[in-house]
């Protein structure tokens, strides 16, 4: 709480990551950012290399076992290479056997997280 969320996902869960960003904006009234792997590794990665861990961000990785193995590996390698340069990510493993199940699960969790965040910081999530 009190930190801006930065949400990352692979191509399969990126629609949900973008929805989390919008929900943080609308429900919790917080600025939030999102990006997707592998694009993150081409440009945005470098932005974290000169940052300090104590920055006011919370990194959230939305992960799916259905992502291509190379995308899954990028999450792991990125976490190792950026250790100490960015906040340790909060890893959310999508539940469900199919992509549709996983997307619906992650959408619902994101709405719950952002509504609960608003309530914890004393905000009314209803006005948009």
Features from the language model and the residues they span:
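A SIS-like phosphosugar-recognition module
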Residues: 1-128
């Amino acid at each position: 709480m009190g930190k801006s969320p930065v949400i990352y996902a692979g191509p399969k869960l990126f629609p949900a990551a973008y929805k989390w960003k919008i929900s943080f904006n609308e429900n919790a009234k917080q600025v939030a950012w999102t990006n997707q792997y592998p694009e993150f590794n081409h440009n945005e990665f470098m932005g974290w290399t000169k940052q300090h861990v104590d920055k006011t961000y919370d990194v959230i990785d939305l992960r799916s076992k259905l992502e291509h193995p190379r995308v899954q590996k990028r999450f792991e390698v990125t976490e190792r290479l950026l250790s100490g340069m960015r906040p340790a990510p909060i890893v959310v493993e999508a539940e469900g056997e199919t992509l549709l199940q996983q997307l619906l699960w992650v959408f619902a969790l994101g709405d719950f997280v952002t509504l609960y965040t608003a309530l914890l910081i004393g905000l009314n999530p209803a006005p948009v």
